[in-house]
Amino acid sequence: MFLFRGGLDPQTASPEEMQNNMQKWMGWVDDLKKKGIYTAGEALLPSGKTLHKGGIATDGPFAETKEVIGGFFIIQAQDMEAALSIAGDCPDFAFGGTVEVRDVMVF
């Protein structure tokens, strides 16, 4: 699983930068699909709710923009090294973004 943080800020990016970045993302996704390693992925809205014991929901979590999880991918990789190599092509690195790479435990 890839968790994406940071990257191009839509609040400050020009329309041209946004369009160019989206084309790079779509090209990357298309490449992963052609290789048969892309399973799923979505962008996430910047805010949500946190549910606590007793059914209490609070706004948040709140974090600095660079810490917000902006989206995720589920991919198929042989091992962590292969997953890191795949993540290395993420378009958001050009804008200071990061990719957290995690194994998913299958039950």
Which residues fall in each region the model found?
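Conserved, structured core segments of small domains
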Residues: 1-107
